[in-house]
Every structure is written in C-alpha cells, then in structure tokens.
From Swiss-Prot:
Belongs to the HAM1 NTPase family. Binds 1 Mg(2+) ion per subunit. Mg(2+) binds at E49, D78. This is dITP/XTP pyrophosphatase.
Amino acid sequence: MSAEILNPNLRRVVLASNNAGKLREFSALFAPLGIELVPQSELGVSEAEEPHATFVENALAKARHASRHTGLPALADDSGLCVVALGGAPGVHSARYAQQPGGARSDAANNALLVRELAAAGDRRAWYVALLALVRTENDPCPLIGEGLWHGEIVDAPAGEHGFGYDPHFYLPQQGCTAAQLAPEHKNRISHRAQALAQLLDKLRATGPVDRP
C-alpha cells in the first residue's frame, strides 16, 4: 500500500518532546503518512515551560516553542492521566506528579504515589487525555488540534512490559488487560494518542492538499 503523503511542507516535523516513549509511539503512527518526526533534542531545542492549567494551552506553548527555534512545523503533545477519585489529578502534572523540587522525573515514583493516593478509594475510574497541537509556523493563526480520551481503571498491581508512564496500572476492562500488556501495534490503534492523531489528521486533510502517489 502506498503511503499517504500530506502537504510536502509537512514531510519533516519537529516533535516538541524529549520523551523517548512518545517518540516511539508517534514515529510509528506517522511513518505510514510519509512524515519524518525529528525530536527537538536533535535540533538543540530545550524543553518548553508548561505553566498552563489545561492540556491544550501547554501543547500549543510547546509546539510554538519548537517551531520558533527550528523554523520547522512542530507537533506537540500534552497528555496525562485524570483520576475520578482525585478530582482529575494528576492531570497536567502527570509527568511530574511525584517530582521533588530540583529532582528528576520518574515513572516509578509517579506510579507509587498514585497507588498510595488511591489506597482508600473505592472508585478507580480514570481516563487518559491526549491533546495534539500542530503548527506550521511559530505564529500559525490556525493551529490544528486533536483530542483523544481513553477510559479505564487504576489497579494497584502493575502488569505488562510495554508502554510507559502509568500504563502498567491503567486497566482496560474491554481488553481485559492493562495498557502495558497491549502489543504496541494494538495500543497504537486504540490509545488516546491514536484517537487524537486521527482527529488531527482529519482536520489536516480538510485544510490542506493531500497527494497520493
């Protein structure tokens, strides 16, 4: 099957993230579209600040930062876990939930804190959120936004070797396993990021030319 090639200006896009797990997932999702994702670290771009209270504002800030420093179109993801019993926390703070001032981020520490916080909670419902923002230029007046939600439950015991972040504790009742137990190719079809990407690409096709070789 021929790859679907989007607007030639989008053949090379900087990914506004230094997260290796996100790079793997997004590279796999974008490869069939003929789009090369280049991590911002390879282009000497530092991480942007994430001062905002919403996923969409943080995603836009990161995308504009990467585009400003590279002159390339930029894709940013701001995603996180929202837990009903915690009032939507950790939310936009998911990646640094257990981070101490001046300390490093750690998936293990984040997961341990999450389990402790839910020790007495009967309601384990949670959902992953993914917000994707694609800007063609730093000052793109019409950035493309895609949103995806993935519902599940938090379990105490981790299971699975795939994925990253909270995946070992994110149980999917319909699949009967955690997100970390899904094969990567399966996860990439149903995850919050896959849903957000599908929405973003629908908008991209509606606003720009699509060439099919």
